[in-house]
């Protein structure tokens, strides 16, 4: 793997991301609470077999799939939840792009490459802002600068005509002379003549194609004179000076209405009102809007977990599994109950939800832990008891499930009754219910140990302690929210008091002062500057008019080159038609030597259409391309000229044509960055190879300058040599533009080569994560080891490949009483496994290096 300095600034933060798909009335869990972080500049790998959840993860990040739960943050923008804010939605479209395995997923076969690549710019409207700034900048230029720009614009177009058409005319004249020699020669057969004609035509077309770069260079240099003028700021009287004086005049006129002290007080009053408005908006965003978005995302996650547990309850006919899933459902519903207090808080921070979510899950789990643990134990022991006792165990399981319902209902009812949002746990209610169901003196022997465990003082003390911890968290949050509300109200009150005092002061100081002399002076100064500008315009106009005459003369003479081009093109066509006719006549003569008289007569009236015309027809289309490119370049030159030197109203009328030019130039830059030619912009996707189409898809993703690119099996359908080219392009672009890449792939060798960190996914979960070097050097998880063993290598060419083991049972023992977690592998920096402690000890001990 390529060594790369790690940047520790997190760009993507994924927490408990879940994705449920509804399939024929039931839910399929594609992602199951996955957590990972991608740092800025990472080439982050995601690997796993088909159906492991790799692509679903990428689609959730870009919201092609709306996550069912969890939190997704990209550059501090919340992307998860049912709906996005308008700001986050616009940011996501501009800064996160995805490239798919099949390029046609993002390429429309009915549109040319220029239209396809520019689509993200149209959606995000980023170019519109650039064009507006461009037009605003033009308004700041002085009259002298504009006239100089006009002269430079004509010079630029003249240079284009002279460079481009002088070379084109040379190639045309050379070819016409060659055709003239062929017309005079009689030593060639029809086949030789046809081959020579095609050869000369191909040479001409190839020579003309070599000159296309001048057209593209001219198109992209239209705004260069303006950029140069902005860099070399000329010290001439511009509109900015008048605008500043007018602003000063307006301020002085306002001062003339009141006294100097009153005017200062009025300014302070307006500033205080703005500060109050900004403070309220800031508090509403930070302590109300943003936290409630996170709250809704958390509740959505919990509700989808409830859907999942209810589905599991409905799909099973096993009493133990039914009871277990029903208890899990109650535990998750209790989380929804306690979340009600958030809705009553006037203000709270989003990190309260982050800090409390996991703790709430642990404590609600502890509240029902004893019941769930007993059900799991009963299920484990059920097969070992005698048949007479099994009925008692089933009855006892049903009793525990009803006891769980009773505990949940009691906690929910107590929480609803309390005005301060707290739970009230009473063991007496459960003991009374238990005594009504069973006679303690005649308790069946088979349930005796479970009974003692459930109704012991130690067990109820644990439950009471967990409930009290929940109450403490809630009361602490309510107290903190109350303090925040008090601080905010105090701050707002101080603003209002200050505003009232300033209003009173303003009334007492309102008496006006005499500013007539200052106002008159400013008006005189403005009039003098306007007079100077008019005088300067007259001087510049006469000077520039003289300087522009030779430029226009040279420009007009350059225009004759295009007329000469059209004349030579007609001459070329005439010569070509004569040669084609000569070749056909030679062909008829050669064919007619062996024909009968009747066949010769038929050939005169029904001549055979030769292949030469059809061959030339496709080649001569290139002249249409030259004409198209020329007219487009000249048309755009006219647009820039009108924008630079036309009336202000006319400039905004040319907003859309100018936008199209800006978009096209950005498309050219994107094509250049992926190693394609600018002329490819006018072709269609079906005219390219698979590797070229993938490059176009990458260019489309890069055009908005995103922070994150999701490469979903980018190279899986490409040849090995093309894979290397595409990956090298992506690596170079990532380094050049500081891109972060989420690289989803099957090819382990490619992931090992290009990625610096990775995660391994199986059945919607992350089973192993860390640095690429550490994982490939010492894979531990059985699934990871099976993937690596099944991966072909040239070093193992004489060894049979290991078959991939699909029957993994490592997750069969996971439950609420035996929860897996991420455990760090010894002697590593960030290598972690998702497993229980028992599995961790066993796998670490048995894991050996894979050669």
From Swiss-Prot:
PROSITE patterns linked: ABC_TRANSPORTER_1, ABC_TRANSPORTER_2
Reactions catalysed according to its record: a [peptide](out) + ATP + H2O = a [peptide](in) + ADP + phosphate + H(+)
GO terms (molecular function) for this protein are: ATP binding; ATP hydrolysis activity
Any one of the GO BP annotations = peptide transport
**SMART domains, from UniProt?**
AAA
What Pfam families does this protein's entry cite? ABC_tran (PF00005), oligo_HPY (PF08352)
Q: Which GO terms describe its cellular component?
A: plasma membrane
UniProt KW keywords: ATP-binding, Cell membrane, Membrane, Nucleotide-binding, Peptide transport, Protein transport, Translocase, Transport
- Please indicate which superkingdom the organism of origin belongs to: Bacteria
What Gene3D superfamilies does the database record attribute to this sequence?
1.20.5.1700, P-loop containing nucleotide triphosphate hydrolases (3.40.50.300)
| Localization annotation | Cell membrane
Where would I find the ABC transporter domain in this sequence?
A: 14-788
Q: Which residues bind ATP?
A: 48-55
Q: What is its main location?
A: membrane
Q: Which family does it belong to?
A: Belongs to the ABC transporter superfamily.
Oligomeric state and interaction partners are given as:
The complex is composed of two ATP-binding proteins (OppD and OppF), two transmembrane proteins (OppB and OppC) and a solute-binding protein (OppA).
The free-text function statement in the UniProt record for this protein reads: Part of the ABC transporter complex OppABCDF involved in the uptake of oligopeptides. Probably responsible for energy coupling to the transport system.
Q: What is this protein called?
A: Oligopeptide transport ATP-binding protein OppF
Which organism does this record belong to?
Mycoplasma pneumoniae (strain ATCC 29342 / M129 / Subtype 1) (Mycoplasmoides pneumoniae)
């Amino acid at each position: 793997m390529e060594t790369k300095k790690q940047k520790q600034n997190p760009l993507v933060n994924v927490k408990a991301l879940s994705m449920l798909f509804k399939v024929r009335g039931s839910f399929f869990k594609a992602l199951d609470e996955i957590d990972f972080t991608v740092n800025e500049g990472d080439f982050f790998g995601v690997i796993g077999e088909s159906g492991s959840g790799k692509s679903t993860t990428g689609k959730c990040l870009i919201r092609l799939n709306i996550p069912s739960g969890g939190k997704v943050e990209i550059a501090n923008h919340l992307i998860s939840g049912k709906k996005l804010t308008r700001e986050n939605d616009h940011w996501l479209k501009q800064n996160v792009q995805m490239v798919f395995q099949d390029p046609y997923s993002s390429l429309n076969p009915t549109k040319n490459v220029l239209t396809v690549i520019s689509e993200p710019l149209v959606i995000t409207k980023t170019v519109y802002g650039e064009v507006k700034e461009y037009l605003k900048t033009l308004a700041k230029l002085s009259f002298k600068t504009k006239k100089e720009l006009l002269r430079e614009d004509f010079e630029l177009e003249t240079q284009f005509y002279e460079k481009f058409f002088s070379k084109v005319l040379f190639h045309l004249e050379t070819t016409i002379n060659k055709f003239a020699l062929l017309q005079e020669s009689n030593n060639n057969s029809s086949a030789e003549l046809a081959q020579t004609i095609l050869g000369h035509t191909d040479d001409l077309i190839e020579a003309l194609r070599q000159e296309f770069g001048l057209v593209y260079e001219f198109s992209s240099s239209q705004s260069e004179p303006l950029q140069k003028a902005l860099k070399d700021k000329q010290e001439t009287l511009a509109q900015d000076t008048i605008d500043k004086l007018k602003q000063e005049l307006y301020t002085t006129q306002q001062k003339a209405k009141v006294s100097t002290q009153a005017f200062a007080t009025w300014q302070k009053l307006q500033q205080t009102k703005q500060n109050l408005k900004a403070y309220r908006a800031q508090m509403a965003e930070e302590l109300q809007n943003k936290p409630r978005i996170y709250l809704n995302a958390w509740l959505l996650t919990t509700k989808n977990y409830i859907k999942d547990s209810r589905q599991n309850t409905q799909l099973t006919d096993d009493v133990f599994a039914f009871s277990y899933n029903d208890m899990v459902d109650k535990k998750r519903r209790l989380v929804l109950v306690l979340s009600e207090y958030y809705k009553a808080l006037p203000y709270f921070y989003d990190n309260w939800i982050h800090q409390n979510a996991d703790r709430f899950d642990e404590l609600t789990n502890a509240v029902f832990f004893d019941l769930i643990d007993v059900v799991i134990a009963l299920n484990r022991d059920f097969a070992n008891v005698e048949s007479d006792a099994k009925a008692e165990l089933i009855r006892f399981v049903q009793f525990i499930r009803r006891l769980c319902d009773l505990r949940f209902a009691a906690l929910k009812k107590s929480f609803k009754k309390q005005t301060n949002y707290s739970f009230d746990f009473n063991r007496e209610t459960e003991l009374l219910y238990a005594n009504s169901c069973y006679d303690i003196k005649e308790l069946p022997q088979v349930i005796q140990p479970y009974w003692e465990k459930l109704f012991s003082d130690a067990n109820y003390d644990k439950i009471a302690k967990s409930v009290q911890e929940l109450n403490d968290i809630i009361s602490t949050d309510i107290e903190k929210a109350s303090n925040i509300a008090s601080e905010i109200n105090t701050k707002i009150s101080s603003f209002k008091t200050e505003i009232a005092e300033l209003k009173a002061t303003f009334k007492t100081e309102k008496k006006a002062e005499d500013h007539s002399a200052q106002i008159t002076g400013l008006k005189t100064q403005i009039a003098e500057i306007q007079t100077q500008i008019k005088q300067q315009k007259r001087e510049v106009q006469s000077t520039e008019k003289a300087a522009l005459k030779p430029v226009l003369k040279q420009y007009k003479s350059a225009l004759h080159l295009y007329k000469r081009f059209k004349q030579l093109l007609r001459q070329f066509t005439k010569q070509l038609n004569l040669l084609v006719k000569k070749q056909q006549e030679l062909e008829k003569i050669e064919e007619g030597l062996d024909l009968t008289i009747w066949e010769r007569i038929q050939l005169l009236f029904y001549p055979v259409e030769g292949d030469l015309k059809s061959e030339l027809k496709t080649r001569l289309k290139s002249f249409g391309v030259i004409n198209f490119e020329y007219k487009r370049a000249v048309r755009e030159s006219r647009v820039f000229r009108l924008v630079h030197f036309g009336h202000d109203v006319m400039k905004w009328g040319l907003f859309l044509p100018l936008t199209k030019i800006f978009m096209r130039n950005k498309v050219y830059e994107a094509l250049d960055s992926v190693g394609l030619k600018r002329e490819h912009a006018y072709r269609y996707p079906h005219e390219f190879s698979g590797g070229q189409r993938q490059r176009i898809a990458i260019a489309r993703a890069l055009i908005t300058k995103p922070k994150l690119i999701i490469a979903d099996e980018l190279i899986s359908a490409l040849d090995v040599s093309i894979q290397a080219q595409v990956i090298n392009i992506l690596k170079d672009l990532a380094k050049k533009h500081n891109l972060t890449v989420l690289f989803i792939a099957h090819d382990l060798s490619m992931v090992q080569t290009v990625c610096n960190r990775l995660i391994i996914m199986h059945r919607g979960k992350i089973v192993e994560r860390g640095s690429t070097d550490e994982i490939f050097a010492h894979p531990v998880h059985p699934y990871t080891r099976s993937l690596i063993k099944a991966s072909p290598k040239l070093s193992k060419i004489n060894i049979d490949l290991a078959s991939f083991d699909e029957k993994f049972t490592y997750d069969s023992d996971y439950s609420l009483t035996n929860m897996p977690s991420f455990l760090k592998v010894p002697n590593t920096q960030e290598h972690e496994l998702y497993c229980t402690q028992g599995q961790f000890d066993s796998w670490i001990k048995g894991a050996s290096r894979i050669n």
